From Swiss-Prot:
Gene3D superfamilies: GTP cyclohydrolase II. It comes from Mannheimia succiniciproducens (strain KCTC 0769BP / MBEL55E). The lineage of its organism: Bacteria, Pseudomonadati, Pseudomonadota, Gammaproteobacteria, Pasteurellales. Its cofactor is Zn(2+). Its EC number is 3.5.4.25. Pathway: Cofactor biosynthesis; riboflavin biosynthesis; 5-amino-6-(D-ribitylamino)uracil from GTP: step 1/4. The gene is ribA. The active site is at residues 129, 131. This is GTP cyclohydrolase-2.
Length: 219
């Protein structure tokens, strides 16, 4: 596979402010990824860029599913970049941890019948995580970024960036969106994938609008 190329860009006004949307494409496969850029991201050597690698999740990002934390993480990351006035969000187009949308729906069906997110992937013949984060390092390079402050709970993203020559000088936690539909999913990511997920179940029951009917009875 040939290396990804920067092919298009334009202004993109959003509810979080004005971004530049930059399109990237593999010339042979035509596989596409995009980055949202705010502010002056030059000179990352002296001033590391606030960054988020966000893998595509149609159900969470666009359809507001509560089965995952993806949509919450997307909006929180864009808001934090906007508040900082400078940063990058790479929209990494590997839906369903790399298995695609239809297979993700199949995995959801297996989860409806008792499997966790990892068991469902394995039952369908996939690895727990099929994503390739190396392309994100290539995108950072094409944007002229060498040092980042990375918004993530996923150690694999940090490890891949460092191995590819992108210096992650700080990890910024992104623990948002926990609710009664995704607590088990988040537990699985923490226990089986090593994600840095912090639970405060009592607090999330009290704060989450979807959980008010399920506040545990205190003895």
């Amino acid at each position: 596979m040939s290396k990804i190329q920067r092919v298009a860009e334009a202004n993109l006004p959003t509810e979080f402010g004005l971004f530049r949307i930059v399109g990237f494409e593999f010339p042979d496969t035509k596989k596409e990824h995009v980055a949202l850029v705010m502010g002056d991201i030059s000179n990352s050597e002296e001033n590391p860029v606030l960054a988020r690698i966000h893998s595509e999740c149609l159900t969470g990002d666009a359809l507001h599913s509560l089965k995952c934390d993806c949509g919450f993480q997307l909006s929180t990351a864009l808001r934090q970049i906007s508040e900082a006035g400078r940063g990058v969000l790479i929209y990494h187009r590997e839906e369903g941890r790399g298995i695609g949308l239809i297979n993700k729906i199949r995995a959801y069906s297996l989860q409806d019948n008792g499997m966790d997110t990892i068991e469902a992937n394995l039952a369908l013949g996939f690895a727990a995580d099929e994503r390739n984060f190396k392309v994100c390092a290539d995108i950072f390079e094409l944007l002229g970024i060498c040092k980042v402050r990375l918004l993530t709970n996923n150690p694999a993203k940090i490890d891949t960036m460092k191995k590819a020559g992108i210096n992650v000088v700080e990890r910024i936690p992104l623990n948002v969106g926990e609710n009664r539909y995704n607590t088990g999913y988040l537990d699985t990511k923490a226990k089986k994938m090593g994600h840095y997920i912090v639970h405060d179940n009592e607090k999330h029951y009290l704060d989450c609008p979807y959980c008010q009917s399920e506040i545990p009875n205190k003895k």
